């Protein structure tokens, strides 16, 4: 079937640990803890990357940028996102819009959302009006509510490239 649109969803979660910078959506946020991971552990950009790759039928971030590969140690997730977008476009698809939710008890995401939107739009090659970021707490429940980690969920729409 030759469908004109595809939808992908992405999810990622990382533990908060001392001694690392907190980078979300390509923005360094002042905080006492950062996210643990092989790369820069940008939970939002990892979920965006998964959503785009999934919508294009190209698997997930782990297939393209495995955490077992030393080449990706400390990698900038914006570089990974741009590479994933190039793969999506090479497969004949173009990003249309991205809707994301960052799940974090702390820090507050809202003051940084505009910069995150600008980064994601630039890296995906779409207008910033086509990127939306929401922030939610976990109301003190579970590991997110206990400030042990931060998660992100993303939905992305692709259109067949002309």
From Swiss-Prot:
Gene3D superfamilies: 2-C-methyl-D-erythritol 2,4-cyclodiphosphate synthase. Its cofactor is a divalent metal cation. One of its GO terms (molecular function) is 2-C-methyl-D-erythritol 2,4-cyclodiphosphate synthase activity. InterPro entries: MECDP_synthase, MECDP_synthase_CS, MECDP_synthase_sf. Pfam families: YgbB (PF02542). It catalyses: 4-CDP-2-C-methyl-D-erythritol 2-phosphate = 2-C-methyl-D-erythritol 2,4-cyclic diphosphate + CMP. Its EC number is 4.6.1.12. 4-CDP-2-C-methyl-D-erythritol 2-phosphate binds at residues 12-14, 38-39, 60-62, 65-69, 146. SUPFAM superfamilies: IpsF-like (SSF69765). The record marks 38, 137 as: Transition state stabilizer. The keyword Metal-binding applies. Pathway: Isoprenoid biosynthesis; isopentenyl diphosphate biosynthesis via DXP pathway; isopentenyl diphosphate from 1-deoxy-D-xylulose 5-phosphate: step 4/6. Binds 1 divalent metal cation per subunit. A divalent metal cation binds at residues 12, 14, 46. Keywords: Isoprene biosynthesis, Lyase, Metal-binding. Involved in the biosynthesis of isopentenyl diphosphate (IPP) and dimethylallyl diphosphate (DMAPP), two major building blocks of isoprenoid compounds. Catalyzes the conversion of 4-diphosphocytidyl-2-C-methyl-D-erythritol 2-phosphate (CDP-ME2P) to 2-C-methyl-D-erythritol 2,4-cyclodiphosphate (ME-CPP) with a corresponding release of cytidine 5-monophosphate (CMP). Homotrimer. This is 2-C-methyl-D-erythritol 2,4-cyclodiphosphate synthase. The lineage of its organism: Bacteria, Pseudomonadati, Pseudomonadota, Betaproteobacteria, Burkholderiales.
């Amino acid at each position: 079937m030759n469908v004109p649109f595809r939808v992908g969803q992405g999810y990622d979660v990382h533990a908060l640990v001392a001694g690392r910078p907190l980078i979300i959506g390509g923005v360094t946020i002042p905080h006492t803890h950062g996210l643990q991971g092989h790369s820069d552990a940008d939970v939002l950009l990892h979920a965006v990357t998964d959503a785009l790759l999934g919508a294009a039928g190209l698997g997930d971030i782990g297939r393209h940028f495995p955490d077992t590969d030393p080449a990706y140690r400390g990698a900038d997730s914006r570089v990974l996102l741009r590479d994933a977008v190039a793969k999506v476009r090479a497969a004949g698809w173009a990003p249309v819009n991205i809707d994301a939710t960052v799940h974090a008890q702390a820090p507050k995401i809202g003051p940084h959302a505009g910069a995150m939107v600008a980064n994601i739009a630039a890296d995906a090659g779409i207008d910033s009006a086509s990127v939306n970021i929401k922030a939610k707490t976990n109301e003190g429940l579970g590991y997110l509510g206990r400030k042990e980690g931060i998660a992100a969920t993303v939905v992305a729409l692709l259109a067949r490239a002309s």
